Amino acid sequence: MKKAKLIFKDNTPFSLDFDDFYFNSKDGLNESKFVYTHSFEWKNQENFIIAESGFGIGLNFFLTLKRLLETTPSKRPKKLFYISVEAFYIEKEQLREIYQKLEFYEEFKELLEQFLKFYPKAKEGIYRFYFEDCFLDLVFEDIAVLKELDFKADVWYLDGFSPNKNLQMFDENLIFEVARLSKKNTQICTFSSASFLQKNLKKYGFRVEKTKGFRKREMIKAYLENELEFKDKEAYFSRTFSSLKNKKVAIIGAGISSAVLAYELSLRGFEIDVFEKYLELGKGASGNESGILSSLILKPKVNLGEFSELSFIEASRFYRQILDLEFKGVVEFAHNDLMQERFDTQRENVLFKISKNQAFLEEGGVIFPKNLVKNLFEKSKACIYFNHEFQAYKFKNECFTLKFKNDIVKSDYAVLIYAMGADTKDFVFYDEMKLSKVRGQVTHLKPFLDTPFPLSSKAYICPVKDDLQVIGASYDRLNASLESKEEDDKQNIENIAEFIDKNTKLEIIGSKVGFRSYSSDRFMIVGNAYDEVFYKEEYKALLWTKNKEQKPAKMSCNLYFNFAHGSRGFSTSVLAARYLCALINNEPLCLEKKYIHAIHPARFLIRKLKKGL
């Protein structure tokens, strides 16, 4: 992404890209309060959403967060969602220097340093920060990304330099998206009073009021009079807002996708029950002694590769923010010509430090799955029911009743979520959803290689832990046995031959078998269960009507899916959990539209219908 070109004038940051100050050079703090952060009233509601065009140095955000935390809880929302779009990246040290030169540093030190600790690299994406009672989604993209987003803001901060120097931030296309992402009575806050901005706001249904600006300036405020109606050509992928009878959630399965989801739900005040068929945690694929956090490396502009990268970096940031984990990196090796070609095309990618046939991923590293899952469940305060093998559910009076083996029944859940990994194949029977259950075996060896970070090629090697070194993993679609196979251990050892001397004697001390869940297109399957009969009837003519407005989708009660994470569940589970929470709790969707379409449970059916099949 583009990096901001800035200098200091009178200790105030000045943009060379826009030939303008980032804010009022004389009294920027008070102007920001007057125009933006103190110009609206909080609402005592579940979620309050502020959207901003132009994050800049983050001053509006920190002022808003301070105001939130200083307000009596009964007079403010329970959770603030702050979504800010920024196209010009400012380096971490530059941000700290700006606050120091402005003499704001001490006032914002605690919040600023928390922010800088998890500040991402200069790469496009949506990055979430966890603050007390607040989620910040920092969107590193051009402002045109708004057309890819889905939320309904309570307040908009239209910031971004003088309109005559940054027309795109105030033009008709932007204001249309602002209106689309607003609801009735959404307030627009802006320092500008430009006539063309007023004209664009009025065109899309805003009531515009001129008011006294900061000091002698004039500014406007605007309020959306009625929510905008627009034609949705892809309504089959659009969200349906949920209505819950209570805040009880049942999750089937106790692996990593369940653990991250339970934690995220707990931040929203849900009561969570988790049902696991085994007698303890760690019996499935999420229970290995060691594993690696890494990313696929595909060619640029490949959706699967870009999604893998975003999943990886957000998982790394999540584990660091929530569990205080530290990562030393992971080395990926190109072990064939195709992989080398991919590596060669990614040399400019800031996530991958590529040298010859090696890529060093600084944000990756070794993970300890059993401990990680256990810690997340403990933080979530979820109640885990072991030895509960799920069989079926009934949905009546807006609640689920669950039936388990041995005639065990649990009831009164407003939401049910399938997160049972490879076992999902036995419970989901959509015609077009093809699921695979793939066996994987890791091998436990006596320590043989001293490495501070994992090495990944045909197979991977983890650093030593507790006098044990894990390598793996096999890949078998045909074998469903839980018993370890000697030939799989042999294959795992053969696949790490490039890392060891041929005379090295390896001692096998154990192995573990798990099963991965895969979709036919390698994307995870996450979202609301859909009404297959409705989809087949309503969208049967998509071959001829795909460019026309579509009828809103019909979903199947409050049943949600969270599976098909393949071998990278410790990466993808974080974005999956956030997205599901957004659907369940009517929050801003934290993914761009292209990714929502890629993981939607109905995507396989829609592809077929578009072909007229």
UniProtKB/Swiss-Prot annotation:
Q: Which UniProt keywords apply?
A: Cytoplasm, FAD, Flavoprotein, Methyltransferase, Multifunctional enzyme, Oxidoreductase, S-adenosyl-L-methionine, Transferase, tRNA processing
Where do the record's region annotations for tRNA (mnm(5)s(2)U34)-methyltransferase lie?
A: 1-225
Where does the record say this protein resides?
Cytoplasm
Q: Its principal location?
A: cytoplasm
Q: Which cofactor does it need?
A: FAD
Q: Which reaction does it catalyse?
A: 5-aminomethyl-2-thiouridine(34) in tRNA + S-adenosyl-L-methionine = 5-methylaminomethyl-2-thiouridine(34) in tRNA + S-adenosyl-L-homocysteine + H(+)
Superkingdom in the source lineage: Bacteria
Pfam annotation, one family: DAO
Molecular function via GO: oxidoreductase activity, acting on the CH-NH group of donors; tRNA (5-methylaminomethyl-2-thiouridylate)(34)-methyltransferase activity
GO CC list: cytoplasm
Name the family.
In the N-terminal section; belongs to the methyltransferase superfamily. tRNA (mnm(5)s(2)U34)-methyltransferase family. In the C-terminal section; belongs to the DAO family.
Q: Specify the protein name.
A: tRNA 5-methylaminomethyl-2-thiouridine biosynthesis bifunctional protein MnmC
